[in-house]
């Protein structure tokens, strides 16, 4: 219900997505399309998660850890989008500023994760590897890596909203199978938000999710895979994100070498 109002506000203010000159020609038609739609479904997902968690008596540390990751990475994306749109700086936050925010978020996540008694054991295709402090480095890499991977994938109408819906549905099933109902609540809350957003984001998109949505979704997926001790599954569930990131890295490397 809030999305049409959000779209209308951006159209009224004539604030929308800026398109880089070096981008594909077909991106030019998207110039001026409202963005930051991720803000709407993030707020909705957080409020729904808390409400359902309270209703089902599942306001656990795990639930709040996941909501923290969703909110913090969303704030980083929000600042990036805000600078792009309202400060008229097409690059938003620079890569160093974004990385510092993502790393700080990952460190806080890991410290809270360990303080709640989680063992720091990596599940590698069914084999449990007790990594100790090294697991902290892995967790940091996982959150930062996948938040950026989802962000890089967000370039085609409806793509991340559709892939995200599939990803959170998959982790919802895993959480249900493991009887981790607090994680299930978060998965379903975000899934509902993404399905509602997809109606407006499918081709031709009336609004984009922006970095506020994509960075938050990627960070949350990584955190969920860790909380479920199913880290390796993200390589399958998030295969498109991994492939897109690898493609971008190859293109950048090729460009620098030529």
Residue spans for each PLM region:
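Alpha-helical transmembrane segments and immediately membrane-proximal extracytoplasmic
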Residues: 19-33, 57-58, 62, 182-184
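Divalent metal-coordination and catalytic microenvironments
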Residues: 37, 81, 211
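Select subsegments of transmembrane alpha-helices in polytopic membrane proteins
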Residues: 31-42, 96-105, 161
């Amino acid at each position: 219900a809030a999305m049409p109002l959000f779209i209308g506000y951006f159209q009224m203010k004539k604030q929308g997505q800026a398109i880089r000159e070096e981008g594909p020609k077909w991106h030019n038609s998207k110039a001026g399309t409202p963005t930051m739609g991720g803000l709407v479904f993030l707020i909705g997902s957080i409020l729904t998660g808390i409400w359902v968690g309270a209703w089902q008596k599942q306001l656990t540390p795990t639930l709040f850890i996941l909501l923290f990751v969703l909110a913090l990475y969303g704030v980083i994306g929000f600042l990036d989008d805000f600078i792009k749109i309202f400060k008229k700086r097409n690059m938003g936050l620079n890569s160093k500023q974004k990385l510092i925010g993502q790393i700080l978020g990952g460190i806080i996540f890991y410290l809270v994760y360990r303080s709640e008694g989680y063992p720091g054991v990596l599940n590698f295709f069914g084999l449990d590897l007790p990594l100790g402090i090294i697991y902290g480095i892995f967790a940091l890499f996982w959150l930062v890596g996948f938040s950026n991977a989802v962000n890089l994938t967000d370039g085609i109408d409806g793509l991340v909203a559709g892939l995200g819906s599939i990803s959170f549905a998959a982790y919802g099933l895993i959480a249900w199978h493991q009887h981790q109902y607090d994680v299930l609540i978060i998965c379903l809350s975000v899934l509902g938000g993404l399905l509602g957003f997809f109606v407006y984001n499918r081709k031709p998109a009336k609004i984009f999710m922006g970095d506020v949505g994509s960075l938050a979704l990627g960070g949350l997926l990584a955190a969920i895979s860790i909380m479920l001790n199913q880290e390796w599954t993200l390589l399958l569930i998030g295969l498109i994100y991994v492939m897109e990131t690898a493609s971008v890295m190859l293109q950048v490397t090729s460009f620098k070498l030529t």
